[in-house]
Amino acid sequence: MPEIIFTGSAGRIEGRYHPSRAKNAPIAIVLHPHPQFGGTMNHPIVYQLYYVFANRNFSVLRFNFRGVGRSQGAFDHGQGELADAASALDWAQSINPEARGCWIAGFSFGAWIGMQLLMRRPEIEGFISIAPPANLYDFSFLAPCPSSGLIIHGDKDAVVPHKDVTGLVEKLKTQKGITIEQRIVPAANHFFDGKIDQLMAAVVGYLDKRIEGGGDPKSETRGRRSGAG
């Protein structure tokens, strides 16, 4: 698990990178929760997401947003953090020029940043969005959502009420050409205390289905966009 440093618009950004042995392996970027509420790339959910992708032969990167850990800069209320995520994807693509696809995964604040990056980077073909803060941030930029993905949350989330996430999912489900799947973890709060195993089981089930459905993530997404599946 090499420690890496790459350059963002606010200076150096620290990360952890797992390279796949396959030159054409897909890329995954994992984004951590809110920097001002203890979010770092070493958060347990971020850490486990990282290994879910690594164990499926992705080249995967997690990193600290600006102002967190050894990453330079200061919290920028989302705009700068989106730039950090774009820089992370640029870095990963620069050392994986033959990558056959790209996924984005994020938890809470990181889910919001990840969905914004999804809109700006058409090469992102799949996403995992955990506890997206639909009541705290504007998600109307997802018009339309360009890729299929998974939204997962707990039904006892007091930070982001169940109804707000479900409302977001229902809006996205009306769009043609993509498939948005929703998973609800029973009795789970916003941080999935005591429920991380169930959370990861849902993530693994979805990701494996996407990979196996088309031989690799990219071909599965193409099938969904063309109306297959």
Task: Walk through the language-model features, giving the residues of each.
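N-terminal cap/lid segment of alpha/beta-hydrolase-fold proteins
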Residues: M1-K23
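Short, surface-exposed "cap/lid" segments of acyl-processing enzymes
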Residues: R21-R62
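Alpha/beta-hydrolase fold nucleophile elbow
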Residues: N96-F107
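Gly/Ala-rich beta-loop-alpha elbow adjacent to hydrolase catalytic centers
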Residues: G106-G114
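Short beta-strand/loop motif that positions the catalytic acidic residue
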Residues: C145, L150-H153, D157
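Acidic catalytic loop of the alpha/beta-hydrolase fold
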Residues: D155-V160, H190-F191
